[in-house]
C-alpha cells in the first residue's frame, strides 16, 4: 500500500497550480484531482497536462469520485466565501481539509509554530492563515516565546502581479484573519495586519515588516537568538525566507524586516507570498501523511468504502 495520501486541489488559480507543481515532487502527497468552475480555465488545462483528473463543476463534480479514487486530503485555494460549504461536503466523506483561504473555520496552522499540536489531534480542517501570516507570525512567535508581547503589527508588501482575483476579493478577510492569528498563534495580546499591493514593474519581491511591543524591556540577545532559530525552521520548507534587517531594538519595540523569495515553480521568484503559502500547506499535508503512515493517528473510517 502506498504511503502517499491522495489529494484533491480545489481552485486552479495561482496558488492551486503552484501547489500541484510542489506536490508532484512530494514523497507523501499525490495530486489526483483539480477542481474548478470554468471549463476553459488555464489552470484546469495545466492540471490535465500534469496528468490530473479535472472537473469544472466545483466540489460537487468531485464528490462522486472521492471514495473510488480514495481521496483523503483536499487543499482549498478558492475563496473564503465558498470554503465552508466545500469543507462540510468533503469532511462528511472523511476527507481532511487544508484551507488556504482566509475563511478560518478551522484552527490556524503555522508549521514551525504549532503544526505538531494539530497533527496529534487529527483536525479535519486546518487553516493556513494567509501568505502574510505565514511570513510574519513565526517572527512574532519568536519574540513572544522569549517574553510577553503586548502588541504585534505586521505589514506584508506583495507585487500586484503575484495576487490573483481570489486574493483581491478577500483583502478584508486577509487583514482580519492575519490579525487574529498574530494573537492566537503568534502570542501577541493584540494583533494588527496591513497588506500593501505594489503595482511596480518589474514586480518587487515579497517584503514583510514585523513590529512587536514587549511588555518589559526586551532581552536583546535572547530575542535575536530566537529569531535566527525560527528563521532556520521556516527555511526548511521555504529556502528563500531571509532576514533583511534586524532585530532592531528601540525602547520596547522590536522590529524585524524579512524578504521572501519563491522557488519559481509556477510564478516567478518574486512571488514569495505564493510559495510560503503553498509550501506551508504542503508541509502540513505531509506531516499528516507521515503520522498516518507511522500509525500515530488514524484516518476516519469510511462506511461506503468498507461496504
From Swiss-Prot:
Annotated GO MF terms: acetaldehyde dehydrogenase (acetylating) activity; NAD binding
EC number: 1.2.1.10
Any GO BP annotation: catabolic process
InterPro entries: Acetaldehyde_dehydrogenase, Acetylaldehyde_DH_C, NAD(P)-bd_dom_sf, Semialdehyde_DH_NAD-bd
Binding site for NAD(+): 162-170, 273
Pfam families to which the protein is assigned, alphabetical: AcetDehyd-dimer
Family, as annotated: Belongs to the acetaldehyde dehydrogenase family.
Name of the protein in its database record: Acetaldehyde dehydrogenase
Organism, scientific name: Stutzerimonas stutzeri
Amino acid at each position: 500500500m502506498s504511503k502517499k495520501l491522495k489529494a484533491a486541489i480545489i481552485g486552479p488559480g495561482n496558488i492551486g497550480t503552484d501547489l500541484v507543481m510542489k506536490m508532484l515532487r512530494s514523497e507523501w502527497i499525490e495530486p489526483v484531482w483539480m477542481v474548478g468552475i470554468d471549463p476553459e480555465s488555464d489552470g484546469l488545462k495545466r492540471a490535465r497536462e500534469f496528468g490530473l483528473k479535472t472537473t469544472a463543476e466545483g466540489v460537487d463534480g468531485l464528490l462522486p469520485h472521492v471514495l473510488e479514487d480514495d481521496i483523503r486530503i483536499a487543499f482549498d485555494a478558492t475563496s473564503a466565501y465558498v470554503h465552508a460549504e466545500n469543507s462540510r461536503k468533503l469532511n462528511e466523506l472523511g476527507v481532511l481539509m487544508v484551507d488556504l483561504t482566509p475563511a478560518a473555520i478551522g484552527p490556524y496552522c503555522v508549521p514551525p509554530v504549532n503544526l505538531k499540536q494539530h497533527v496529534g489531534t487529527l483536525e479535519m480542517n486546518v487553516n493556513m492563515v494567509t501568505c502574510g501570516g505565514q511570513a510574519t507570525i513565526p517572527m512574532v512567535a519568536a519574540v513572544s516565546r522569549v517574553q510577553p508581547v503586548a502588541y504585534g503589527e505586521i505589514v506584508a508588501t506583495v507585487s500586484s502581479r503575484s495576487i490573483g482575483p481570489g486574493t483581491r476579493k478577500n483583502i478584508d478577510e486577509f487583514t482580519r484573519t492575519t490579525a487574529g492569528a498574530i494573537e492566537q498563534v503568534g502570542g501577541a495580546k493584540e494583533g494588527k495586519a496591513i497588506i500593501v499591493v505594489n503595482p511596480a514593474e518589474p514586480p518587487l519581491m515579497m517584503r514583510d515588516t514585523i513590529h512587536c511591543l514587549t511588555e518589559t524591556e526586551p532581552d536583546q540577545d535572547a530575542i535575536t537568538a530566537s529569531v535566527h532559530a525560527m528563521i532556520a525552521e521556516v527555511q526548511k520548507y521555504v529556502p528563500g525566507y531571509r532576514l533583511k534587517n534586524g532585530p532592531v531594538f528601540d525602547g520596547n519595540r522590536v522590529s524585524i524586516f524579512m524578504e521572501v523569495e519563491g522557488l519559481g515553480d509556477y510564478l516567478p521568484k518574486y512571488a514569495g507570498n505564493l510559495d510560503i503559502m503553498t509550501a506551508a500547506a504542503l508541509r502540513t499535508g505531509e506531516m499528516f501523511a507521515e503520522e498516518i503512515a507511522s500509525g500515530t493517528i488514524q484516518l476516519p473510517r469510511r462506511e461506503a468504502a468498507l461496504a
